[in-house]
Design a protein with these regions (language model features):
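Short linear capping/connector segments at secondary-structure termini
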Residues: 54-55, 87-94
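Amphipathic alpha-helical packing segments from all-alpha helical-bundle domains
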Residues: 93-117, 122-139, 151-154, 158-162
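Short, structured helix-loop boundary elements
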Residues: 13, 35, 39, 64, ...
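Short, hydrophobic secondary-structure boundary micro-motifs
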Residues: 12, 86-89, 150, 171-173
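Helix-turn-helix
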Residues: 6-36, 40
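Short glycine/proline-centered loop/turn elements that form peptide/ligand docking sites
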Residues: 7-12, 34, 112-123, 166, ...
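Hydrophobic alpha-helical connector segments
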Residues: 40, 54-83, 130, 153
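Alpha-helical DNA-contacting segments of helix-turn-helix folds
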Residues: 3-4, 31, 38-49, 88, ...
Length: 174
């Protein structure tokens, strides 16, 4: 991940081999091909995103502030490592990234719904939908930078929260 962050999203296996001082044949002892190596990078990035957003969500108090904290942690991660984020997006075969992050959002939303005594059946659909929304907005923000990260967090939270809160009066009161 460090090599991609330092050298950019267009990095190839030769670049990774040189930068990490590991001969290319050694990579192929562990990975069958370049795609498998890139998939592992995507998984590592997704696991980092999950860890960072989990820490931020756990530190927040109310459900709404947890939503904002999760969005902010996601945006902070891509802001600090834009080339790594672009690398993951550039390689469309890295579906695991979206799945790992989407399942994490599903778990968080499902927990909120169950705590409020609500049916959590919509959690997966909402989790993946919210991840897609935030990811699309993040892509645009990363390219345009027409507003601060805090403003993006506020706008996205304002857009998403009424849908989540409307599902439960207990959440809405938080």
């Amino acid at each position: 991940m460090t090599v991609v962050s330092e050298q950019g999203a267009g990095i190839g296996i030769d670049d990774i081999s040189r930068a990490s001082h590991i001969a290319k044949p050694i990579f192929y002892r562990y990975f069958t091909d370049k795609a498998e190596l890139f998939i592992e990078v995507g998984r590592a990035v997704a696991e980092t995103v999950v860890a960072e957003t989990t820490a931020a969500i756990d530190a927040a108090q109310s459900p709404r502030s947890k939503l904002a904290a999760g969005i902010d942690a996601y945006l902070a991660g891509i802001e600090s490592r834009p080339d790594l984020y672009r690398f993951v997006l550039q390689h469309r075969d890295l579906d695991d990234y979206a799945t790992i992050v989407g399942l994490h959002a599903t778990a968080v939303i499902g927990e909120f719904m169950r705590e409020a005594g609500q049916d959590s059946g919509a959690a997966e659909l909402w989790g993946f939908g919210i991840v897609g929304l935030v990811r699309a907005a993040a892509d645009r923000w990363l390219e345009q930078r027409t507003m601060s990260r805090a403003a993006v967090v506020d706008y996205l939270t304002d857009l998403i929260w009424p849908g989540l809160a409307g599902r439960s009066r207990a959440l809405d009161a938080s």
